[in-house]
Amino acid sequence: MSKSGKKLTQKLKKNLPVTGPQAPTLYELMQWYCLNTNTHGCRRIVVSKGRLRRWIWISLTLCAVAVIFWQCALLLMSYYSVSASITVTFQKLVYPAVTICNLNPYSYSKVKDRLAALEKETSQTLKNIYGFTEPLIRSKRDVGVNVENSTEDIFLKQIPLYRLESVKGSQLVVSDLKTKKRTRMSAKVIHRDAESVQDPGNMVGFKLCDPKNSSDCTIFTFSSGVNAIQEWYRLHYTNILAKISMEDKIAMGYKADELIVTCFFDGLSCDARNFTLFHHPLYGNCYTFNSAERGNLLVSSMGGAEYGLKVVLYIDEDEYNPYLSTAAGAKILVHDQDEYPFIEYLGTELETATETSIGMQLTESAKLSDPYSDCTMDGRDVSVENLYNKKYTLQICLNSCFQREMVRSCGCAHYDQPLPNGAKYCNYEEYPSWIYCYFKVYKQFVQEELGCQSACRESCSFKEWTLTRSLAKWPSLNSEEWMLRVLSWELGEKLNKNLTKNDLANLNIFYQDLNSRSISESPTYNIVTLLSNFGGQLGLWMSCSMICVLEIIEVFFIDSFWVVLRQRWRNWWENRKENQAEDTPEIPVPTMTGHDNPLCVDNPICLGEEDPPTFNSALQLPQSQDSHVPRTPPPKYNTLRIQSAFQLETIDSDEDVERL
């Protein structure tokens, strides 16, 4: 083909009409898209010559589209899997708060007047069960309290003690530990120490009944009489303390200068003024070092045993309650300054006559909240009210939820948890059935029937101290004599006694190093990463950009919709016109003329046969109803032919150009 022919062909193709979105059919729309798209595969399908090449490009394009859908599905699954990555960093930190408690909550000499009747019944019960004599029980101290002789045991009457002798189905054979009377009864048995009873004759427990329904009773059994007596004593002890004011309980506890004998921090001397009072319902007066209530937080200058907190504690074992505290020593807890010290759950015990060295390592954790986890940032989105007025923790939420259910079900609050607004602590005088109700609510709480475990969530950010403990005998044999003499002389005015090593406990708590471990979560996939990966997959498999994606949306969704809609509208309109033409009746042409013509009845211009109409009057005459448009097809001229814009016909000669 000559150069002039090629130029003419290009000019004709350029000037041919391109319909695009206005294409009458989907086929022409797809053909226009494939010729004009930036996606190479679709264009090669149209312009390739030969059926084999065309099918190859169709297969490759479809495979690329399938791979894109597969990879994008994997990306979406990764995005909605809400996985998180963990970052570990190390940084320096301040010294934590350290709470110290004596295992004996109250000095016995200060509380014995309130517990005299309970102690009398307890010792008498032990004598009835095991044959203990009075001097054996009180060999280490003299109670020194005159208790009025009374034949009525009020504590055993409120909570009677039994020995479980045999179990036959639902029938129990028990013997009263006071009267030795055997009784057969029907009651539920709850084993506090074991799930099954191997030897019922060794089981000791107490019976609780619902005052409103005397037949509804439960016997709580223990595998050892020691545990049964302690639990029975603790219930009455709690009932007595619930009626004592906070001021009196603080006065009955240990003072800071009585508990803290010596103190050193970071190589410098400290004293009781560096400790803050914290009254615990179970451990009495506890003291917190570095609580941040007295000013700035303390910081360790270096890591190691020489730069931590060193204290010598006075345990005063002679003032221990024998039925309440069976272990002698102290209990400590390392915690953050704004956290409540749950020392009964997380505390570490210290032995007497022992030096306890504790190395600390802090780990700070920060989790992602919803949708990555079910944690809460500050507890405001938790339905349970915080009764502790401290930073939210899971344990605070669980205890607050239990106390709320206790008040709702029993009408009073348990002594171990803070008192809600408008509630009172449980006691026998005002709430006779509170113990039975307490065990019933506690059983529901343990079995997760109260909904507390589902309502409470973990905190997203928290601090955790890993403790490494080591023990050493203290003081040594060579230093015991002079050290105890010096300490006895310094505390002589307060103690009026010579100290022994069993009265003291030594604590050394320090950072192993000044680095802390920080664990934080970050989303593995976010919206930016998702879009970036989508773009990478489209560009890798189809050389497609965001503009190409918009083209696909425009052509395959918007333009295709309008093309189909126009086709349906055109078909409907043509069918409607054909139906109207078929339903229209043919009106015959009237043969009458002049005044006899019914068309001229109301027309004043109608003329007779003898009067030919003028030009103006003829224009005003009504038209004939049976006039038809001629349906003769137009002549076929070669000059009226129009070639399709998408016809890729080649022009090989000037004759073809002239023919076009």
From Swiss-Prot:
Extracellular-facing ranges: 77-537
Control of this protein's activity: Originally identified and characterized by its inhibition by the diuretic drug amiloride.
Principal location: membrane
Localization terms from the record: Apical cell membrane
Database matches in Pfam families: ASC (PF00858)
UniProt catalytic activity: Na(+)(in) = Na(+)(out)
Keywords (A to Z) from UniProt: Cell membrane, Disulfide bond, Ion channel, Ion transport, Membrane, Sodium, Sodium channel, Sodium transport, Transmembrane, Transmembrane helix, Transport
Cytoplasmic side: 1-55, 559-660
Disulfide bond positions: C101-C286, C209-C217, C263-C270, C375-C460, C397-C456, C401-C452, C410-C437, C412-C426
Transmembrane segments: 56-76, 538-558
A cellular component term, taken from the record's GO annotations: plasma membrane
Name of this chain's protein: Epithelial sodium channel subunit gamma
Organism, scientific name: Xenopus laevis (African clawed frog)
Gene expressing this chain: scnn1g-a
